[in-house]
Amino acid sequence: METSGKTALITGGSRGIGRAIVERLLADGHQVINLDRDPPSAPAGNEVFEQVDLADEARSRAVLSALAERWSITRLVNNAGVVRPGPIEEASTEDLQAVVAVNVASSIRCVQAVLPAMKAARYGRIVNISSRAALGKPLRTVYSVTKAGLHGLTRTLALELGAHGITVNAVGPGPIATELFDQANPPDAPATKRIIESIPVRRMGTPDDVAHAVAMLLDDRSGFITGQVLYVCGGMTVGLGHDA
């Protein structure tokens, strides 16, 4: 087993917020393992990429087991997520199962895979990527249920694992200018302008904003921060309804 002491596992690290997190951790000197369905467009030199559909339990367990045998992983970022938007009348059991499989179940599997190494080291950092949708968002019933579930997972694991030197926190991004967001919300569109006007700092967030928060929570010096949800939202979640 390779025990560099700074090995981080991240899910969904090939694009968007996940890619920014990978690049930040590499810049900070981590060995980074990226689990994703698709490879990154420009793999980094010190990045290990494993192609896996995290909704596939058998395949993902096999990959995680092999990685845990090779690496002493002491940092985990559960970033992979899927969305199936729609009104509550159209939410199906299949939708719920599909979103839970990636957003919640795969996060639990990843924690289970890295815990032996973290407990052996008496040190670990786990960050779950949530969303402001956990506080409620129209047409996101299934998605918001899973992200709120990550909050419960975060708080429960913080209580269970704190005595082992393992911290568990969540980061909840607000509106972030990723490629997918820009495709759905053109920068000059009136709806996009309304979103920006609703953000106290009057700008969209960037993937790097989220990566900075994640890097802080993964830092050695963050050992007294656990069980918390940090919203990276430009203040949007502070004043929900303040203009009503």
Describe the residue ranges of each PLM region.
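Conserved NAD(P)H cofactor-binding loop of Rossmann-fold oxidoreductase domains
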Residues: 79-84, 235
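Substrate-binding pocket helix/loop in short-chain dehydrogenase/reductase
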Residues: 87-88, 95-100, 191, 195
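Active-site loop-to-helix junction immediately N-terminal to the catalytic Tyr of the SDR YXXXK motif
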Residues: 91, 132, 137-145, 156, ...
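Alpha-helical segment proximal to the catalytic Tyr-Lys
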Residues: 116, 159-163, 223
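Short, flexible catalytic-loop segment of classical short-chain dehydrogenase/reductase
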Residues: 172-183, 232
